[in-house]
Amino acid sequence: MREPTVRGRYYEDFGVGEEIVSGCRTIGEGTIDLFAGVSGDFSEVHTDAELMKDSEFGERIGHGILALAVMQGLMWQTNYNTGTVTATAGWDTLKFRAPLRAGDTVQAQWVIKDKRVSASRPTLGILVEACRLVNQRKETILTGEHVLMVRRRPAAT
């Protein structure tokens, strides 16, 4: 197999405190429906508009994990790590702060919180990104720390 084309940035190119912002995406009713089908989570909070009219939300809402998936997709679409990322090592301190609603336009925003060279794999660096997904009302939908493994520049290893 061939090596991936590198359009993204290597570990050395990131600075602690650097902020990165994605483009925007509007969430439709169909997105919520499709995610229910993919995930198998058909909970009425996500699928029953009539029942949810009288809930604390006033309408059905998107899945929390859908919000996470959308945020990760928005992050990927910036191409900040295309060809240099090797894996997501995990999501820490994930918190759902506000509901994701059909019609919301959302944006991913993140800051490089920490970085270190992998002790076990010196060709890789580990980035800790403090991430949040915000909507058009400037409400934070979710927050979390994304731990990402990124290739180091070949000359740096």
Where are the predicted features?
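HotDog/MaoC-like acyl-thioester-processing domains
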Residues: 1-16, 96-157
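Hot-dog-fold acyl-thioester-processing enzymes
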Residues: 1-89, 153-157
